[in-house]
Regions:
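Bacterial Sec-dependent N-terminal signal peptides
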Residues: 1-31
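Residue-level detector of intrinsically disordered/flexible regions characterized by low predicted structural confidence
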Residues: 4, 218-220
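Core segments of small alpha/beta cavity-forming domains
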Residues: 20-91, 156-209
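Long, acidic/polar, low-complexity amphipathic helices and coiled-coil-like
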Residues: 25-46, 106-158
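Short, exposed beta-strand/loop patches in secreted or surface proteins that constitute
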Residues: 104-106, 216-218, 240-242
């Protein structure tokens, strides 16, 4: 009887220990995971402790450089081999070793969301990317759509640069532009009569088709954020849901902006602008 009781006690002890270990792992994972964008910003700035409790300007640890270094080292997607350790080290150094270390500011501009969504267009599911930014609204702020990209619109804006002879004569005004008729005879050649300075605007077409009812929203597939707030740097933020501690909202891309025009080029690339 004693042997049976001893066996039961040992088994129960191992079970309790295993349960405690599992709970500790879950707790550590919870603290390691950056669950929200606001939490990412606070951790980047050194404005919360390991348990997610906020620090305020009156707290000793508020924006502490050692705390920031600790967080910065775990805020990268470690599975992305495209971000070298040297680049990460240089980024962390640039952030922390300046006279006034830069911080992320939720209301500071120079960051925006990329929302990859699915819409139904004329009975067919189509991917459409919405670019969104914060703007002031009354006493607060709100998210607004400021750009749109949809592959299905590309053909509508293509201009055939090989075709010659399709133009309106410079004296057309003397004929009250009666020759405009030929510009609209063929719908595929209308773009030949448009100014070279014209820039395709997918957002206008998107709004027109939304109001007309020819496209209908279905779902959001993925969300990313693009940050240009740190001088000389750009980084992309994406969400990762997977086993382990390297989880949640993490830096998924990092680029050093060395030349004066790098930021403008990168913004055009992100926005799918040629």
């Amino acid at each position: 009887m004693k042997r049976v009781l001893f066996t039961l006690l040992v088994g129960l002890s191992f079970h309790v220990q295993a349960q405690l270990v599992d709970e500790m792992k879950d707790e550590s994972r919870l603290y390691a995971e950056t669950k929200q964008i606001n939490q990412f910003i606070r951790r980047f700035n050194g404005e919360e402790d390991e348990k997610g409790e906020r620090y305020y300007a009156t707290d000793k640890q508020y924006r502490n450089l050692k705390l920031r270094k600790k967080y910065l080292e775990i805020l990268f997607d470690r599975s992305n081999t495209g971000i070298s350790n040297d680049l990460k080290t240089q980024f962390v150094k640039d952030v922390l070793e300046k006279k006034e270390p830069p911080i992320l500011d939720f209301h500071g501009g120079n960051w925006f969301a990329e929302v990859q969504a699915t819409f139904n267009a004329n009975g067919k599911d189509q991917p459409i990317t919405l670019f969104m930014e914060l703007e002031k609204h009354h006493l607060g702020t709100r998210w607004t759509i400021y750009k749109v990209h949809a592959d299905m619109y590309n053909d509508s804006f293509k201009r055939d640069t090989v075709v010659v002879g399709k133009f309106l004569h410079p004296m057309s005004h003397e004929l009250d532009f009666m020759n405009l008729r030929k510009a609209f005879l063929n719908k595929d050649s209308v773009t030949q009569y448009v100014s070279k300075k014209f820039t395709p605007d997918h957002l206008s077409v998107f709004l027109y088709e939304s109001k007309k009812g020819s496209i209908k929203y279905k779902s959001v597939e993925q969300v990313k954020f693009h940050f240009f707030q740190i001088p000389g740097w750009y980084f992309e933020l994406a969400e990762f849901n997977r086993p382990g501690y390297n989880n949640g909202w993490l830096i998924s891309n990092l680029v050093k902006l060395s030349a004066p025009g790098d930021e403008a080029i990168l913004r055009r690339y992100v926005h799918h602008e040629n």
